[in-house]
Amino acid sequence: MSKTTATATPKGKTNAPCAPQAVLFDAYGTLFDVYSVALLAEQLFPGQGQALSVLWRDKQIEYTRLVTTSVDGAHYQPFWELTRAALTFAIKKLAASADFTRANTEFDSKVEQLMNQYRSLSAFPENREVLQALQARGVPTGILSNGDVAMLTLALKSSGLHPYVDHIISVDAVKKYKTHPAAYALGESTLGLPAAKVLFVSSNGWDALGATWHGYQTLWVNRSNQPFEELGTPPTRTGSSLRDVLGFFPVSL
């Protein structure tokens, strides 16, 4: 495990916010590497694994937005089902020439293999170190995720992170996916703190933006050196790994 500490860059507000009293993490893309399925995808679909994993993720997020903006949430589906639907779409789009059909047993087998892999995504290497440090400093922690509780619990247990997370918060409780305000409000109600006193951490720029709009202090973990969303609201800070969370919670002397 690398011990190199990245320096977080302050962004945006000129008035320093109050020190946060708790931290919430996004799960998929932040704690868990959603592209770690690419190796298996490449084995199943030679030459298309990386493209498949990217399209799968993009379509997954697109589907969350589609069902959230439907009238009164009439078309809401749990995240696991949207993830499966997105994978099915991605395979059909990229592997059309492979002569698969939805009823084909081999097609279904490959979907199941990739879905099983998604249950236990790889965690980023610094995660345990950071979560242990937060626990040692007495900082309450939680996950606020589009994933359902069963998905999140299994992912945490399989990665060994479960003992270091105090709260598992799923948008399934309100049936509105991020960036809907009702999704972010779950963090406040669970922690019993206003958003301004909570740090929200995400590696997804759109998620960091939505959390900032809601009033959270935010850390955007920009692992791949991407530009931030061009909508006029920067995160509180930008970092390059989860270790930058610890800069918000210095050790007391």
Feature map (PLM): residue ranges:
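Hydrophobic alpha-helical core bundles mediating ligand binding, dimerization, or RNAP-core interactions
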Residues: 41, 56-60, 83-84, 111-118, ...
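Short, acidic loop-to-helix structural element flanking the phosphoryl-transfer center
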Residues: 80-81, 100-143, 153, 181
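Alpha-helical elements of Rossmann-like donor-binding domains used by nucleotide-donor carbohydrate transfer enzymes
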Residues: 39-40, 55, 85-89, 113, ...
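Short helix-capping segments at alpha-helix termini
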Residues: 45-49, 93-106, 136, 160-164, ...
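Active-site neighborhood of HAD-like aspartate-dependent phosphohydrolases
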Residues: 11-61
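A metal-dependent, Asp-based hydrolase signature
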Residues: 50, 63-113
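Asp-based, Mg2+/Mn2+-dependent phosphohydrolase catalytic module
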Residues: 2-20, 132, 144, 148-253
